[in-house]
Amino acid sequence: MTKGLHVPSEIGKLRKVCLHRPGDELLNLPPDELERLLFDDVPFLEVAQQEHDTFAQILRDQGVEVLYLENLVAEVFDQVPGARAEFTDQYIAEAGIRGQHMPQIVREKLDSIEDNLEFVKKTMAGMTKSEIDMPLTASTTLDSLVNSESESDLIIDPMPNLYFTRDPFAVVGEGVNLNRMYSVTRNRETLYGKYVFKYHPDYKDVSLYFRRDCQFHTEGGDVLNINEKTLAVGISQRTQAAAIDVMAQNIFWNSDSKVERILAFDIPVSRAFMHLDTVSVSYTHLTLPTNSR
């Protein structure tokens, strides 16, 4: 495995890619909360995994090294003492857990998972009440009684959008934007990137041009490397102009960056024009059948 990052352009030979294989997070999608979790329908997990595996194998057949986000994070926990405990603290703090006793119950459940890869997958999948044995003091609260009819079985939301791995963090040349994402639903996804770029031996030394604790939001789908010296960024529903200001300052003042100009494209603020990569299509050449008209 080669170390570091190098993406001078979106067009060219792909050598390495980071994916996420759809997992149990899709099983924890409540049908009545799809819109909040940014889904239109509940995918069939088995088919989603089959299609993903086919896609990943096509990449491998073309000589692409396929990495998995869950494996990278698990490798960090395997190799770095204290990293998993640090992650667990932050994960629970950002999980939106309701109830005085529930965070400790969740911690005990997570700590009981010995295998680091299974632990990572569990944090991605979310957690339901049916998975744990809750004492009466935790399961019966004023909040649960008042909201009993509308209360979800979820203790922690799943992260069903994780297979869009470009959005939480995007490579810019030899550095990376670790994004603060538009929605609360997706912003927790960037926590995995934080630990990869903070601790993983292959990626801990790369430059960060944007950090997940920034007050402005941006997503990787709005960032396109045109060439080594030119970066395109969309001003969209998911990326604020102020975020591009922060990004630009960090890129231009970083001695390792080769980017000399950033082009900002103002696109409609709506989900239909979600990102710059939604409204722009890159290709090196177009092939048409000889009988096309």
What are these regions (language model features)?
Residues 1-288, 292-293:
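The feature marks the mature, well-folded catalytic cores of soluble enzymes
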